[in-house]
C-alpha cells in the first residue's frame, strides 16, 4: 500500500495522528473512534516513507488480543517486522535474551499463578487462609508490586491511598506476607510476572551495555491503552526510552477501570506536564455505535460531575446511521431476567444476528450461572469468557501438530484453506456442526475457529505473500505464545472488566441495580466514579442493539427491594416492568402438578430427558429444566404452537425436541376432571 493510500483511508483527525511521526504525541481516543486504525496507519506510513525502520518500532499494549489485532492490521497494511506485544511479553523476551549474559545461566522459572506461594507464605506466618483469602492476598501482593511499593512501605502506602487490607487482615500482616512471599519465591527459584518487568527495568538501569543495546534496537515506542499503565510499567517504559522522546501514547481517561490493580490515568492526564512540547490529538468520531448508543454513553459520563471526571471526558460524535433505541427492562427477579435476556438473544439470532456478535455483560462472574442455565434452556450456545484457554484444548493442540506435519508436504498449487480442511477432516472436523451441544459441539467449534482463521489469512494474502500452511502454523504459534485465540461461535457471557477492548452487534447489560452497579464494595467517591466508567465501557461495547436490565428481587417470589442504578437517573424511562413470567421454583416442580396422571407425565418427561442427556453427554438440566417439564405436564400441549408458549422452550429446542415431547404428552392418559 502506497503512503497516499494509507492516508486516504483515514478521517482528518486520524490522518493527523498518522502524520505526527515524531514524538512526543498523546492521542486522546474515545471508544470506537478508530485508535488502533490510527496508530497502525501511523506506523505503516512512517515505514512506507522511510521515516521508520520496522524493527526499530516497539508497540506495547495490555492484552494479547490487542497485540494480535495490531499485528494483523500491520500485516494487512503490508508492514512486517514491527514488534507488537504486551508489556509482559516484550519484557520476558528481552529478559530471557540478556539474563545469560548479565547474570549467567537460565533465568528463573516463571510462576504464572501466585496461589501456591501465597498459601505457603501464609502458612509460615501461622495465618489461616482459605481459597478466597489466598486470591485476595494474591491481588494485594500484585497491587503492591505494580505500584512499586515494598513490604516496608506497604503500611504507609495503603494508608495514604485509603486502601484497606483484605478482609480479616491488617496492613502490618500484609506487609509481613509480602516479605514471606518473596522469601518463598527465592527459595523455589521462581519469579512472577511483576518480577519480569522489575528485573528488566533494573537491568536496563544498572547495566549500560544492555540499555544501549535495547535502545539502539528500539528507537520509537507506541503505548496503547495508556490510561491503564501502572507505575511499574511506566518505570520500564522510562528505561526503554532512556530520556528520548520518540513516544506516542493513546488512551481514554473515561475508560480507566483497573485502578484496583494499580493502574492510574495520571500518566495520561499529566503527559503534557512531563512533555510540554507534546502534540495532543483528539479522536471523537465514533464509528462503532449508533447515535442511540453513543448518546446514552455520553449522558452517563456527563452526570459524573467535575469530581467524577466529566470535564475530562471526550464527547463522542456518532458516525453511523440511527439504530434501534436502547431498551430498559425491570424484571421480577434474577431468574426472570436471565430467561428474558436469553429469549431476546434467541430472537436476535433468528433475525440474522450471529451468536458470536451477541454478549451478555455483568458486574461479577458469580452472575454468569443464571445466564448459563437460561441460555442452555433456550437452546442457544454460549461461551463464558475466561474459561479454558483456547490453545490449552487438546483438540487444538492435536490439530496444530497435524498442520505442522502437513506444512512439510503441502501442495503449493492447492488453496491453503482447502488443504487445512482436508487435514482437520482427518481429525474429526466436518463441514456441518453436530446437532448436539456439550463436548462434541465445543470440539467442533474450536476446530472451526482454525478453519475460519485459515480463510481469513487467505483473504489477506497477496501474490507476493501467498497464504500457506507454514504461514498458518507460524500465526498459530505466535497466537499461542500470546494467548490470542481465534473467535469461537457462541453468545459471549462475560464480566464488564473482561469485555474491555471488545465489541459486539448486540449487548445486554444485566444486573443494572444498586449493589451491583455500582458494586456494594465501592465505598469511596473514587471507587463509585470508577464504577460509572465501567458502565460507560459496557455501553460502548455495543454497535447497534443495547439492552439494560435488572431484577427487582434476587429469587422468584422474593421481596422486590432492588432499585435501578443511580448512574441511569434521568435516563431510564418510566415504563412498566416486564410481564411477570410464570416460573416454578427449583425443587418444587412436582408439588405444583395437579394430579396423578400429571405426575406420571412429569416422570415420563424426566425419563426421556435423562436418555437425551446420556446420548448427548450433557447435564440433564441443559436439555430442559424441571420447571419446564412441570409446566409441560400441567399444560399438556397438543400442538407446537401451544408448546412454544411454555416458559423455557426456545425455537432451537422446539426444532430438536418438539415432536418427541408432543408424542410423550399424547401417550400419557389425562386424569378426568373431578
Give the role of each language-model region.
Residues 1-104, 108-109, 212, 242, ...:
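P-loop NTPase Walker
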Residues 163, 167, 354, 368-380, ...:
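Conserved helicase C-terminal RecA-like lobe
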Residues 591-638:
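C-terminal accessory/binding modules appended to enzymatic or scaffolding proteins
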